[in-house]
Design a protein with these regions (language model features):
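RecB-family 4Fe-4S metal-dependent nuclease core
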Residues: 1-166
Length: 166
């Protein structure tokens, strides 16, 4: 009997082993702007085909999104916007790959779908900022991951940059 982790690898090979595609990147970093906000993150895997880019988000949990909800999944929508920014002349397909069940749920994002992601995303950001205390942290270990600190846009980041360039 093989372990659950080994079985996941066997299942992945069974799913992708015979396909021809280019794994463009794994843990692909993205950074794009919507309104006044920089959206920064990482996509688990990006495959490039002749006319299409497929974003693959691996899921390890048991809870799955219903197929009907994949098109409106905000995380996949953000990834699709990032891919559309990086590959403006290709179709964008986003997939949730559930490693435990082996199920893959996908949606090809149209231009209209991509536009429909933007407003809810900005609304969500505005609500988070309105409902939360987002004052800068004094913990430089946390700051090392923050673009505001790297740019010196906050007091902690500015002090850190001054020390770096003395």
């Amino acid at each position: 009997m093989i372990s659950a982790g080994d079985q996941i690898i066997v299942d992945l090979y069974d799913t992708y082993g015979g396909r021809t595609f280019d794994v463009y990147d794994k843990e692909m970093e993205f950074n794009f702007v919507i309104g006044n906000y920089s959206i920064i993150g990482f996509i688990d895997r990006v495959d490039v085909y002749d006319d299409c880019v497929e974003i693959i988000d691996y899921k390890t949990g048991k809870r799955e999104v219903a197929q009907k909800d994949v098109a409106t999944n905000l995380q996949l929508g953000i990834y699709a916007l990032a891919a559309a920014t990086a590959f403006p002349n290709k179709k964008i397909k986003a997939s949730l790959h559930y490693l435990r069940s082996g199920r893959i749920k996908s949606h090809e994002f149209s231009k209209a779908d991509l536009e429909n992601v933007k407003s809810p995303l900005v609304t969500r950001i505005n609500n988070i900022l309105k409902d939360s205390n987002f004052s800068p942290t004094k913990n430089e270990r946390v700051c090392s991951f923050c673009d505001h600190a790297k740019s010196g846009a906050c007091a902690t980041g500015a002090a850190r940059l001054k020390r770096m360039f003395k």
